[in-house]
Amino acid sequence: MSTVPEISSAPFGRLLTAMVTPFDTAGAVDFALAARLARYLVDQGSDGLIVCGTTGESPTLSWEEQYQLLETVRNAVNGSAKVLAGTGSNSTSEAIHATAKAAEAGADGALVVVPYYNKPPQAGLESHFRAVAQAAPDLPLMLYNIPGRTGCSISPITVQRLMNCSNIVSFKAASGTTNEVTDLRIRCGSRLAIYSGDDGLLLPMLSVGAVGVVSVASHIVGMRLKAMIEAYFAGENSLALSHHEQLQPLFKALFATTNPIPVKAALELIGWPVGAPRSPLLPLENQMKNELMKTISALLQT
């Protein structure tokens, strides 16, 4: 039986931003704005950036757009933060190709979502992720479980079976429950770095063994999130809880409708006009935008 090496507690840092994809008024990717936004997010506390994930609207980006975004963001941050590429697909061959391409392009890691729509059984999920891992053996991978989007969930037992793939080093937990973190910790221990995939559950997930977060809210309150994480790991639990409670209204507002619709509107409100989402997503309705503005204004006063 192979010996699986231990990994560092947070291989990509503790605060990762699932970065939006900026579009111009014609709906084309605004690569220059993506570069500026990437540098801003790092300045606001992000240890890593994930391009072309759910928040980055990967379903409506071509593979060529995704590869160019990866290159753009990597060049923009110039080693000051980890850059991960979303390379998941419900086609194993597509995921293999995209992950290998990300490795060739110099990504620091890849976010690989559970295959969506076709609902493979657990054996199929194991085979899928094993094949992707073997296609880019030197690229660290983060598995991504978000059953509300994919219609399918990878079980902790299946993840445990994948632990002999040495480059599967982390897991984005977005099932909406802390139980997933506990079950993974029991089965995989410190071998697997678990990241909260839900801003609102970050503090509870840290308390049961998560190492950090893949955040949407960090587009708006990166330094506040960083402060909460640092307070928690410094043992300042009351301070961490205070941050958690103060940020809850924003967390809820950013998921009042489908992500990334609200966060794109929020970015515009704070001076980053990143464009509307691509169809079939729509811009945030005016009433919800007004409520979002009130939430952000109130938060900035605390």
UniProtKB/Swiss-Prot annotation:
One of its GO terms (biological process) is lysine biosynthetic process via diaminopimelate. Pyruvate binds at T55, V214. The active site is at Y144 (proton donor/acceptor), K172 (schiff-base intermediate with substrate). The keyword Nuclease does not apply. GO terms for molecular function: 4-hydroxy-tetrahydrodipicolinate synthase activity. InterPro entries: Aldolase_TIM, DapA, DapA-like, Schiff_base-form_aldolases_AS, Schiff_base-form_aldolases_CS. Its EC number is 4.3.3.7. It holds the Pfam family DHDPS. The record marks T54, Y117 as: Part of a proton relay during catalysis. It catalyses: L-aspartate 4-semialdehyde + pyruvate = (2S,4S)-4-hydroxy-2,3,4,5-tetrahydrodipicolinate + H2O + H(+). Homotetramer; dimer of dimers. This is 4-hydroxy-tetrahydrodipicolinate synthase. It comes from Prochlorococcus marinus (strain SARG / CCMP1375 / SS120).
